């Protein structure tokens, strides 16, 4: 764990309570919702902090991550003036050990073609905080329920959660455990915390 300057608008929560997560139907439109932590394998006194990731200021971004590849990915996806695609970040993903975007293994072992998916939310940051210490490591997998507006009227099989460790640059693609298409509530299992975004392969993807 180490001290970090948290970015953007920060919301904090005790793990047994709820917090504000930012997500939205399109890049640049971020809508707060309230997630729930399902898992109980969290340290006493821990909080989750959730924030937007400001990619417009180099010093702020440097405080978030020293990994140049992660910086490039975040800048590309969180650019409000463009519509990033998997194709535009393909070379960056190669540097993150995603060699073939058409044949990627998810955390659960499924094979997916990322080129079928579109980014529907910018990257946001989720971290664990104890006092003034921040960590992206978890004590095993962490089950989370979170409402995301972009997930409304969607099917679980059409969505992927992309999660990036800002410290190591590790990237994982996570299938959705459960979904409520009416509220947009997703249940997902996270192996660590960090920068996350939602990918959608349905025809209605933004």
Language-model-detected regions and their locations in the chain:
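Solvent-exposed loop/turn and edge beta-strand elements of beta-rich ligand-binding domains
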Residues: 5, 20-21, 123, 138-141, ...
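Proteolytic-maturation and junctional protease-sensitive modules
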Residues: 136-205
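Self-processing/autoproteolytic domain segments and adjacent N-terminal interaction modules in large
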Residues: 53-137
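Proteolytic processing hotspots in large secreted/extracellular or virion-associated proteins
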Residues: 26-36, 108-160
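Gram-negative bacterial Sec-dependent N-terminal signal peptides
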Residues: 1-23
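Sec-dependent signal peptide cleavage junction
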Residues: 15-32, 205-206
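A generic structural signal for short, non-catalytic loop/turn and secondary-structure boundary residues
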Residues: 16, 41-43, 137
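N-terminal segment immediately downstream of the Sec signal-peptide cleavage site
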Residues: 25-48, 53
